């Protein structure tokens, strides 16, 4: 049996070859940013679960930056980025209120 994906034909035109090259680069960049997003969110949630208010606040600021970047580049919709920031912010604020 053949493997999962069928083999794609090579583009004939120069513009098609260029788009294929660009697609590979963009895919790698998007995958990297998506991974950075997941890591940032996980780190904030770990800090919240551990009850470390200062670390959670610090990591949340970094996560906000990553979320904004991803929304600006169009990897995630801006509403999804805003929703994720809001939910993370609520968790960090709840931790701050519980500590007070």
From Swiss-Prot:
Residues 1-22 have a biased composition (Basic residues). It comes from the Bacteria. It holds the Pfam family Ribosomal_S20p. Residues 1-26 are annotated as: Disordered. One of its GO terms (cellular component) is cytosol. SUPFAM superfamilies: Ribosomal protein S20. One of its GO terms (molecular function) is small ribosomal subunit rRNA binding. Keywords: Ribonucleoprotein, Ribosomal protein, RNA-binding, rRNA-binding. GO terms for biological process: translation. Belongs to the bacterial ribosomal protein bS20 family. Binds directly to 16S ribosomal RNA. NCBIfam families: S20. This is Small ribosomal subunit protein bS20. It comes from Acidovorax ebreus (strain TPSY). The gene is rpsT.
